[in-house]
Amino acid sequence: MSKNSEFINLSFLLDHEKEMILGVLKRDEYLKKVEDKRIRKLKNELLEAKRRSGKTHQEASRVCVHCHKTLGLIFDRGDPCQACSLRVCSECRVTGLDGSWKCTVCAKVAQLRIISGEWFLEEKAKRFKQVNVLGTDVVRQSILRRSPGSEETQNQEQAQQCVDKSDTLSSVRQKTTHDGPKKKGFLLSKFRSATRGEIRTPKPESGRSYSLDLDSQNLQSFKSASGSDRGSTTSSDLIDQEAGRRTSKSSYSNGGIPVTQRSPVPSAHSVTSINSREHGFENSMALATIENTCEELTKSHRRNTSGTPSIAVSGTSLSSERSRSEVDLSESFAEDLEDTSSIRSRSVPGALDKDLNSLEDTEDGVDLVSSRFSANTHSLASGLSTNSQAGSDRKRSYLNVPDADSDTTSLNSMMSVYSETGDYGNVKVTGEILLHISYCYKTGGLYIFVKSCRNLATGDEKKQRTDAYVKSYLLPDKSRNNKRKTKIRTGTNPEFNETLKYTISHTQLETRTLQLSVWHYDRFGRNSFLGEVEIAFDSWNFENPCDEWFVLQPKVELAPDISLQYKGELTIVLRYIPPEENLIFPAGQRQEKKIFKRGKKKESSSISGGILEVFIKKAKNLTAVKSGGTSDSFVKGYLLPDDNKATKHKTAVVKKSVNPEWNHTFIFSGLYPQDIKNACLELTIWDKEAFSSNVFLGGVRLNSGSGMSYGKTVDWMDSHGEEQRLWQKMADNPGTSVEGVLMLRSSMAKCRL
């Protein structure tokens, strides 16, 4: 379908008929949004079911892949699904009308394909080439499109109106002496309201409505038409031509009034110049010029507002649809002020500790520099944003949205260290936050005006001081590009008066949730959590924005089924070599294995205990952090509870890929069979950043999932699903390599089952 054939000639329709059709199209668009929400809900349920079961490779295990029920050897053995070939129990089956059955996940996939109409779109794509053009869009564009003859008719009508004005110009000269000041005052007020967009262009007499995409050449064609229709050189014609020439300029010599798109009001110099005119011929010509300018500015304003291009989703929205990145936290400033438990937890989201150890790796040094820099630069650490006073005259559009270039714009906070690491302090959450949320459909701008907070908790009990700031995310995206922050305000009733801005289409905004959290900033320690608010935009009313108080809520750790988010997959191969098999290796090979156990003294020529080999094979569908849709990723590994920095293993950095292949082996020695039940293999994937903190892309933990390690309760023994099965399979088959594909966690915080 060519571009010209995408329009239908609907010029025969009257205005009320077009309005009725547009009303039907609007209802159709609303129903489509409702249907999209229903399909998204079904897709989320399907994703949750897949995540619950995981991608398992069952060779000898007798476990149902979905409900994890242990299968019997004779009775209730389970059968492989006819679609996915995974073994499931009798309760995880869905029988069809023809008697065949599928597992619950495959049945949901088939049901989603039918309900969403995907099968119809596939059949349509086979028969028709242009499947991306909807009939409703064609009708809507055809109605809003101006017919070819309407432009000429409009020019003729405007030219006739201009001729009528020239006929009455002589009478205007006579009345100037008596009511000139009143006329000028009225026109000036009319000009001010026109520049603000308050004057509405009247409908033409033909009964046809102007389209929303008028050309910018309309004004020029009007002036050329008005000049060509008049052949005589009377005084009134000369006056109209002179007025037309002055109107077409960007600034007027008689009034000094600049004609620009973004001018809200005329300057003081312009008003003074106009009011200081003397009566007579020049005065009447100025009045006619201003009157024409009012109408033309009104039309130009309507063209500019309606001719705004379609909303372009920012790079933040596109790249962050599936991203929830977290920052690799390394040494921070003045770590010796607080007690710590491990260095490992400082580099893993889920725990923030502050130890001061020797810098061994390059990225650790960079993280230390960035942390100190952010701590010393108060303005940068608290976010790059500008204030707007509460009583200031703020420029707003027709939806009560501040202009994008006003003094309420907020920028990304790129120099701060993330607080979303699972350690929120022990401050009791109290207080409320006052917000004004609005959305501009023309520019796709979401504006969160943070006014103030009241009755906040005290952030520092020793100093009885609260240095509060507000941080926001559009969930599920928690990447650095999606974070906004206000400046730091002192007191338990701080006044912020700052606007946090996001650029996102309204369709995507309906799938997002705004998370606003209040934090106490500690220059030499960790920030304390003071409360948060989560606002879902799926049913939010943007038509009537108003100020609203929201009660701050404490941080709630969600269950894994709710907080899980797809971050990609990691393929690894595990092999445990027990001590008895390790002893048969030659002495030279034993010494070579000894080298891989970093941080231990090489006093003994033999290795005590067994060896754990972890082959880091590859990853798929990692989060794209770089601007080109890629990441520079590497894997970091610990064998807990041994979390010393000297025992950390790292792969090389694979640049510019979201599907990296490392083919690197980690070797941990000194492991006995009883240690396997109490140890935990923690693997995290990071994006390498040259001059800032590394970005967390996902991770896994492999252990028995008992929650206990050597008789102590620990939060990192929390494996479940495929992580737990792969670790148990390795322990049950010593000396044998076992391969598994693991779903990456979006956060390394404790998973509560």
From Swiss-Prot:
Residues 224-237 have a biased composition (Low complexity). A zinc finger (FYVE-type) spans 64-106. Residues 150-174, 214-223, 249-275, 380-391 have a biased composition (Polar residues). It comes from the Eukaryota. SUPFAM superfamilies: C2 domain (Calcium/lipid-binding domain, CaLB), FYVE/PHD zinc finger. Gene3D superfamilies: C2 domain, Zinc/RING finger domain, C3HC4 (zinc finger). Residues 145-279, 297-359, 380-404 are annotated as: Disordered. The modification Phosphoserine is found at S147. Residues 7-123 form the RabBD domain. It is a peripheral membrane protein. Residues 195-206 have a biased composition (Basic and acidic residues). One of its GO terms (biological process) is intracellular protein transport. It holds the Pfam family C2. PANTHER family: BITESIZE, ISOFORM I, SYNAPTOTAGMIN-LIKE PROTEIN 5. This is Synaptotagmin-like protein 5. The lineage of its organism: Eukaryota, Metazoa, Chordata, Craniata, Vertebrata.
